Regions:
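STAS-typified acidic loop motif
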Residues: 2-39, 56
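Amphipathic alpha-helical interaction surfaces in cytosolic regulatory modules
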Residues: 28-106
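Short, ordered loop/turn segments at secondary-structure junctions
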Residues: 89, 112-113
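Short acidic-hydrophobic, aromatic-tinged amphipathic segments that line or gate anion-handling sites
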Residues: 107-111
């Protein structure tokens, strides 16, 4: 599934054999990306998508409005009892995500392989 070339969805398998839904973000993530980012997440059946990986490797630009969208997804996932991990952030955004408290809701990994080995 792909939404306006901003988000693609893929099923992966974690190290423990569990199914992980990977949402791969691409291009610019800002307030105009709401439908792509939040809408794609909200379209998932929460009961069958218990483990989510948010991959930012393809993101070229992410502003504070985009970070707010990520936080919205994380808050909804937390309420639904889903496990969320994040990978593919630049060193700068790893620092920003840590500073704004995103690590309270999702573990950060340098890449997909590291995330899958931990999930």
């Amino acid at each position: 599934m792909q939404t306006a070339n901003k988000v693609s969805q893929q099923q992966l398998t974690g190290a423990s054999g569990q199914q992980i839904t990977c949402l791969r973000f691409n291009g610019d993530i800002s307030s105009v990306s709401r439908d792509a980012v939040v809408g794609t997440y909200q379209a998932l059946d929460k009961a069958s998508h218990k483990h989510i990986l948010l991959d930012f490797k393809g993101v070229e630009y992410l502003n504070s409005s985009g970070i707010a969208l990520v936080i919205q997804v994380l808050m909804e996932a937390n309420k639904s009892g889903q496990t969320v991990a994040i990978c593919g952030l630049t060193p700068h955004f790893t620092k920003v995500f840590t500073m704004v408290g995103i690590t309270k809701y999702a573990a950060l990994y340098p890449d997909e392989a590291a995330a899958l080995s931990a999930l």
